[in-house]
């Protein structure tokens, strides 16, 4: 069986991570959460109150990002510290576009992601996987959904974690995040020419997963 690379790109809260994790489990692939890696860098920036890319990178090099399967699914570590929950706060969410747009940060993260992915058998999701990180991925999906649907998903997710959230505020934040991600100078959010456009509005997670798995199995 061929060890393929799957790239899933799309805007914030379009369901990329949820879908990628399920597919990774079903098809026995490694799931590399690229968004979490940039969130870790953002968390470091906020903790250290710095926007110096070199300082952020040096700290992460001393406390490498890694992933492990925990009781509630995949957990994110920075060195020995479990940062799974703290990198999902609204403060991190609203700052991650700024940090991830830094050239030095992106180059560092892309090199790390490519190193992990080079042997295949991997699925990655993010903003520029199919265009920058894995331009030769076997299967590329560009997953989108309406702002209202994405806000509703994030709202329910935050409530389930006990995070106080205002739905209308979320809609504004997601729209602004879309604008930032699509217009930034470095690796803007855009669909790769050879990616399959998949609109998840009104679709269940199972329907999305099944569609992508069927495409993947044709290549394996």
UniProtKB/Swiss-Prot annotation:
GO terms for biological process: nucleobase-containing small molecule interconversion; pyrimidine nucleotide metabolic process. It is found in: Cytoplasm. GO terms for cellular component: cytosol. Pfam families: Cytidylate_kin. Keywords: ATP-binding, Cytoplasm, Kinase, Nucleotide-binding, Transferase. GO terms for molecular function: ATP binding; CMP kinase activity; dCMP kinase activity. ATP binds at residues 10-18. Its main location: cytoplasm. Its EC number is 2.7.4.25. Gene3D superfamilies: P-loop containing nucleotide triphosphate hydrolases (3.40.50.300). Transmembrane segments: none annotated. It catalyses: CMP + ATP = CDP + ADP; dCMP + ATP = dCDP + ADP. Coiled coil: none annotated. CDD domains: CMPK. HAMAP family: Cytidyl_kinase_type1. Belongs to the cytidylate kinase family. Type 1 subfamily. This is Cytidylate kinase. It comes from Lactococcus lactis subsp. lactis (strain IL1403) (Streptococcus lactis). The gene is cmk.
